[in-house]
Amino acid sequence: MSSHVSNNSILDPVTFWNQANKSLIRYGGDFAPKIIVRAKGCCVYDEQDNAILDFTSGQMSAILGHSHPDITACIEKNLPKLVHLFSGFLSPPVVQLATELSDLLPDGLDKTLFLSTGGEANEAALRMAKVYTNKYECVAFSSSWHGVTGGAASLTFAAARRGYGPALPGSYTIPEPNPKLSPFRDAKGNYDWQKELDYSFYMLDKQSTGSLACMIVETILSTGGIIELPQGYLKALKKKCEERGMLLIIDEAQTGIGRTGSMFSFEHHGIVPDILTLSKSLGAGTALAAVITSEEIEKVCYDNGFVFYTTHASDPLPAAIGSTVLKVVKRDNLVEKAKISGELLRSDLLRLKDKHPLIVDVRGLGLLQGIEIASCTDPSKPSDFLGTVIGDKCLELGMNCNIVHLRGIGGVFRIAPPLTVTDEEIHKAIEIFDSALTFTAKEFSGSY
């Protein structure tokens, strides 16, 4: 049944939500109760032109903020010339961006495949690992999120596993190094991640049929609650993979292109992955992703018949935008700015932690920070309910600070403003978060 709604009437809130509820598929929780009509810099604006600080950078993607003038100019320049091509055609923007990434990255990350989303990039990376090793078993952390398509979804263990039937055969998990939850301790009671890693691979070897192809990891598990891998862990993990002939895939959807105070987060750990995937931040809010690997791995995959035809592989317009993103990040020194702004953000969050007992931990790196909200009745566990209350109050007061409310991790806020965020915007966000915490403590103290 067709119905016509004019552009003017759809901005009436009642009409808008009636049409939304009638026409849209819900794809993960409820929609935020705001009608967003434009975005600029670090803010989005509703239909009444109220500014909302965007401390999730859209979907953890808009690292240059919204409507950045260089991105706008790039689109205006390239849109009349080249947008989309047959997947077998190449264009100058694609070759240029691949060359720029190769120049930025260390040896061993030399060749690039351009796609649209992080899940798609991880899917391609997993297929490459299987073709290269001629094996099929893949491993991820128990709080991982790598996408919602077949292979990526099979290796997403944080949430959204039930109700979809069996995962792909050979999909395994090991515990992420979480010092708060792990039972592995040394003689003094300190967390022993090496012992945990050794035991994890002992159990993995027991389950494997001898066909281990790869492990895929984030350097900071974002959906898992902002869990940062400890220093030394990635080196030890890579050694475990090499001993078994496995490839190590690092998924930098959220940490890549400067967010952690380094251009790529794996650089903090002194290793080079076999395959690197980028998405979200590479396009700064536009649909661009990349799979990057060595010449040797690419050649073996090609010789073995690797195929990943997809509609928007090597599209020229997103590639042109990606080059512009890299240009702006380097020109405006945004990697160093993310480090400095991240230190300011972290110090302000720690000040809030000292003031509010509801905050039990502040963790993260650069402009990717996590705030764990504990239950009033059980400080050892993040509180889904209180996290939702605080997040909703922040939105009411003018800040978006959480992407989704997932069961079991709703009490860990992911704070990830654009790299262009100002000191004043950080302080304003802290004021809002302070007010939301004060409200929640007053309303629900002793109840949850």
From Swiss-Prot:
Belongs to the class-III pyridoxal-phosphate-dependent aminotransferase family. Its EC number is 2.6.-.-. It is an enzyme of class 2 (transferase). This is Uncharacterized aminotransferase C1039.07c. Keywords: Aminotransferase, Cytoplasm, Mitochondrion, Pyridoxal phosphate, Transferase. Transmembrane segments: none annotated. It is found in: Cytoplasm; Mitochondrion. GO terms for molecular function: pyridoxal phosphate binding; transaminase activity. GO terms for cellular component: cytosol; mitochondrion. The keyword Repeat does not apply. The modification N6-(pyridoxal phosphate)lysine is found at residue 280. It comes from Schizosaccharomyces pombe (strain 972 / ATCC 24843). PROSITE patterns: AA_TRANSFER_CLASS_3.
